Every structure is written in C-alpha cells, then in structure tokens.
Amino acid sequence: MLVHLSCFLIASTQRNLGITDWYQHAIIAYIGVLIVYFLAQVPLQDLRKYILTIYFLTISTLLYVNFSGTSALGAKRWLSFAGFYIQPSEFAKLTLILVLASILDQKRFSDLSHLMKPLFVSFLPWILVFIQPDLGTSLVFGAILLGMLYWSGMPYEWAFIILATFVTGLLAYLYQFGLFIWIPIIGFLSYRSLPHKKKLITLLVVFFHSLIAKISPWIWESVLRDYQKDRLILFLNPSQDPLGGGYHMLQSKIGIGSGGLLGSGLMQGQLTKLKFIPEQHTDFIFSALGEETGFLGTLLVSLLFFILILQLIKIAIEARTDFESLI
C-alpha cells in the first residue's frame, strides 16, 4: 500500500512529464519484493559467511562512485545502469546493518574499547558518503550505529557519551565557555559507568571531546558546504531566508496546511501542480501527501509506518538468535 501510494505521489509531482521517476520507482519496488522473497529463503547464518566479502564490495562501490559515478545537482552519488540510476549508499545501509549485527552478536560491553570495531566499520562508509557529498545519508549511518548499539545492550551512559559529541561540537562553535563545564561532566559520567580501566579510558574520552571542541569550528568553516550549513541553520528557522534556503520548508508547510482535513484529491494539488516546490518528488514528497490527502491521509500513512515499525520490533524480539534480532 505504501509503495503504490508513493508511486501516485511521485507521478503527481511530475505530471505532464510522461513516464518519469514513478515508473522507475515502481519497477525497482517490484524487483525489490522479488529479491526479498529469494533472500528470505537463505538462512541468515549462511549469509553470515559472506558478510566480509559484501562489506568490501560495498566499500569498493562507494569508492568507484566518488571517482567515476554520475553527477546530479552537484553531487556524485549514482551509478547508471540500463537507463536506471542506482545509489550505492542505499545498499551500504543494508551492508552496515549486516556487518554490525555480526560484530555485536559476538560482544558483550564491558568497557569502551568494545566500541572501536563497530565505530571503525561504520566510519568507512560514512566518510565515503559524506564526501560525495550526501550529508543526509551519512547521518543515517550514525543513526543505524546508535540504534544497533542500543539494541545489543550498550549501557545508557555510553550512548549519552557518544551523543554528547554533537553537543560538544555545538558548544565549541556557539558557546565555548560552556565547554569548561560540559567536558568535565562527560569525564565524570565516563569514570562512573566504566567497570575497568576507569582512569585511562576517562582520559581518552576527555581527550576525544577536547579534540572535537578544537576542530569543530574548522569543520563548520572549511569542510561543510554552504548548502549543508544552510540546511542545518534553516531547519530551526526557515523564515530566516524565505526565498532561499528556507523556501522549500516554508512552501511545504503551506502545501500541507492547504490540504485541510481531506485534501484536494490525488493528482489535484494546486501547489504541487504549479511546481511551487522544486524537486518535490525527493525529500519533500510528504508535502504532496499533505496537500492531496489532507490530515486524514497523513495520519493514515503515519499509522501504517507505526504498524510496520511495531511489527519489525516484534520480529526482532521473537528472533531465535541475537544476530537475527539485530538484523
């Protein structure tokens, strides 16, 4: 149901253009269903034998894309194959899940050194996707890592220490005096939550956060591109640049609000029809859903996703092994 609805919405954002992205979307979805069916016949423990090979193939593909991939809108993210555009970073997400499941199935967290291997295997695809550049997908890799670490039993304090890295970076750029309070708090939590090698690992954690504090302003000024900075700033305040970087978000809100309770009907959205939102079929497809199906339509789709997530959690809980549960 979600796949078919998404095809209608993509077609709605590209009406009068003939067979466009919705057609490729539908074909890839049906091919994906077939692939899932055949993969479901393969025992996961057998698949585990090939995880290292799959990981190296994925890294090799990401390297190839960075040097010889197809460029669009200033980013080199795609491979062209038989008229279709394939984004290897999407497959890299699945690969990372498999690799992390294999690693975390064998580990029980007793000190922070057990995080090194999961962090390393996550870092390689993350950095290769980040330099394409694709900030959004690279952040997804971080979410996958944290989610799987949590599910595998990582202590809450460690999760906080990892997430605190982002706070350290923000403070370094916005309020450096706060670091004199923040970093000692992180050090105290590290010392309190570690069963072994407390002093050494606490010093390493404090050193790491101090390093993040030192390089964060440089990353913001020299590494992030202007459009990436705009996305991060305008996410909180799109009205700061209503005709520039904040235009998409503001128009999307208008489109969603104009849908009212029942919406204008599929393929009938006026803002969508008049192309008020450029490239609406990508990150802003939800605005077409809100305009054309209204509040009830967005509520239904949100409910379908909620049911899907609950079902996935149920499957993970009932899995026979930790490896299967993590996947």
Predicted regions and their residues:
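Hydrophobic alpha-helical transmembrane segments of multi-pass inner membrane proteins, especially
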Residues: 3-12, 16-243, 291-327
